Amino acid sequence: MTKAQNVDPSEIKKFEEMASRWWDLEGEFKPLHQINPLRLNYVLEKADGLFGKKVLDVGCGGGILAESMAKEGATVTGLDMGKEPLEVARLHALETGTKLTYIQSTIEDHAAENAGTYDVVTCMEMLEHVPDPLSVIRSCAALVKPGGHVFFSTLNRNIKSYLFAIVGAEKLLKIVPEGTHDHEKFIKPAEMMKMIDQTDLTEMGITGLHYNPLNDSYKLGRNVDVNYIVHTKKY
């Protein structure tokens, strides 16, 4: 596999078709808007703030997390392979007066040219959409400076996550479009830790992300059965 091949064209196409609705708070990306404050606060807490830091958001899509980190005073670069989502992200940043940079590139190509550049790297809800997640994790490790932080979020692979993320979220509640996720691409925490151990990163903590359908809200917690976030640091 070459560096340029760690892309699933069907995944890119799927998100490009929804690109115009990235910033619709009641559209397909509503869950990302709902969980963004939780993700942002987790990053802020674990990375000791973002002000003045160089940050890379891998798989940034329409820029929901990237823009919020820029508003915290970080110098943010958003990276994605989808042309349409990036155009939406650039337009929204222009409309809101948010200063950040968006680049269409694979993480592997970006890492080859920018090793040790960033204080913080975020890779949220992206690993389950690529053929080779280890390649992405290795590239994130290469891109962050020694002493820097890398954050990964994805979905666990088990019966509960299938029932919650696919049967519940996609088929019954229609929270996200059907076909958004492939359960076979979900990553168990033990598998995630094994991949992290093959890099210069050290796992610093893991937290679960929980959805309550009764009040349509999310919270962080200890249970990592479905969604989870991993905090790592490069020593």
Swiss-Prot record:
The question of whether Transferase is a record keyword is answered with yes
Q: What is this protein called?
A: Ubiquinone biosynthesis O-methyltransferase
Q: Which CDD domains match?
A: AdoMet_MTases (cd02440)
Keyword set includes DNA-binding: no
The superkingdom of the source organism is Bacteria
Quickly give the catalysed reaction: a 3-demethylubiquinol + S-adenosyl-L-methionine = a ubiquinol + S-adenosyl-L-homocysteine + H(+); a 3-(all-trans-polyprenyl)benzene-1,2-diol + S-adenosyl-L-methionine = a 2-methoxy-6-(all-trans-polyprenyl)phenol + S-adenosyl-L-homocysteine + H(+)
Q: Which residues bind S-adenosyl-L-methionine?
A: 39, 59, 80, 124
Q: What does this protein do?
A: O-methyltransferase that catalyzes the 2 O-methylation steps in the ubiquinone biosynthetic pathway.
* NCBIfam families, per database record: UbiG (TIGR01983)
Q: Which HAMAP family does the entry mention?
A: UbiG
Q: Which GO terms describe its biological process?
A: methylation
Q: What keywords are annotated for this sequence in UniProt?
A: Methyltransferase, S-adenosyl-L-methionine, Transferase, Ubiquinone biosynthesis
Source species of the chain: Vibrio parahaemolyticus serotype O3:K6 (strain RIMD 2210633)
InterPro entries from the entry? Answer: SAM-dependent_MTases_sf (IPR029063), UbiG_MeTrfase (IPR010233)
> Which EC class does it fall in?
transferase
What protein family does this chain belong to?
Belongs to the methyltransferase superfamily. UbiG/COQ3 family.
**EC number(s) from the headed UniProt entry:** 2.1.1.222, 2.1.1.64
Q: Name one GO molecular function term.
A: 2-polyprenyl-6-hydroxyphenol methylase activity
Instruction: Look up the record and name the pathway of this protein.
Output: Cofactor biosynthesis; ubiquinone biosynthesis
Q: What is the lineage of its organism?
A: Bacteria, Pseudomonadati, Pseudomonadota, Gammaproteobacteria, Vibrionales
